[in-house]
C-alpha cells in the first residue's frame, strides 16, 4: 500500500469545526486518489447508481467487498471504496462520490489506515466528525453508520490505538441523530483477545468471506432500521 503523509491535525480540527456551515474549500488530500475517483465517476455515467440506497464508502476493505450486492440481496447498494484511503479522503471526495447518489444511508469503513500512518485516536475521531458534517451539509437527513476499525493480524500492534479510536467514535455517535456505530471488532477477536486468523487473507490485513460475513450480520439490523428489507 502506498504511504501518504497524515492530514495535519489543524486541518482535521478545522474540518470538524466548520464543515457544517462555512463556505470554504477543502485543502487537497496529501495523497491524491483522483484516478480511482475518476473511475468511479465514469462508471456512474455509464451505469447510473440507484438513488435512495445504501452507499458504502471508505478504504480497501470496502473496495474489495466484491460480493456486496449478493450479501444484501434486493437492497440498492453502491460501492464507493477507493485505494487505501483515510477518512479525510472520503470527506474531500464526497462531492463527487457520495452526495450525487442521494443515499438514504451511508456506511463508512475507514480509520484503519489513518492509525497505521500515525494519526492519533483523537484525529481519527475528528476526521469522522468532519465527514458527517460535510455530508450532512448537503444531505441533512441522511443516516450514517460507521463500521468499527477492525482488529487484524498485520496491525495487531496498533490495536490499542484503534480500540481507543473506536471508543471515541462510539461515544460521539451515541449523542448524534441517525449516526450509528457498528461494532464488528468483538466478533473478530478470539477468546484471548487476538484477531481470528481464519477471517483474513494471506496478507493478514484484508478479510476473506468469513470476515465479511461478520460485517453482514452486524449491518443487517442497521439497514432494517432504516427501511431496507434484509434477508
Regions found by a protein language model. Name each.
Residues 153-231:
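Catalytic His-Asp segment of secreted/periplasmic serine-dependent ester chemistry enzymes
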Residues 139-143:
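A short helix->loop->beta-strand "cap" motif at the edges of active sites that frequently abuts
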Residues 94, 128-133, 166, 170:
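Generic structural signal for well-ordered alpha-helices
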Residues 25-102:
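Serine-esterase "nucleophile elbow" of acetyl-processing enzymes
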Residues 2-14:
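Bacterial N-terminal signal peptides that target proteins for export
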Residues 62-78, 89-125, 129, 145, ...:
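Oxyanion-hole/transition-state-stabilizing segment in secreted/luminal serine hydrolases
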Residues 57-58, 81, 111, 184-185, ...:
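A secondary-structure boundary/capping signal
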